[in-house]
Amino acid sequence: MAKKKETPSSLSSSAPQIYEATLGRNGAVVKGQKITQLQAEARRRAGLDVVVCGGNLSANRSFAGAIERNANGNGKRCPPHPNAGMHALPHYQPDPRPPTGHTFYETPNRTAC
């Protein structure tokens, strides 16, 4: 039987949005085009970055974790890496690696640009 896909359990009126992502200067995460959850999972399987944006930290974190687990089977939640730069975002990444890349998510104090 196929594994059931995870989705965010509680969506607020401003549900998180997913975007393609690239890394900018000083750890900044730069938003690209808006994408669907399925597109985000495909990007993550290919080792590319995505970012979950919205005003609800809990929903963003939950959605990012679901994307990473659906794409790669297991995900490790990581704080912003100090060596990445002052604008780095928290994220999920495969554990163990590969593939490369991250599922970033916004917080009230750290956002994608």
Regions found by a protein language model. Give the residues of each.
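Short Lys/Arg-rich cationic patches that frequently serve as NLS/NoLS or arginine-rich RNA/DNA-binding motifs
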Residues: A2-P8
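Catalytic toxin/effector domains delivered as secreted proteins or via bacterial secretion systems
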Residues: A15-C113
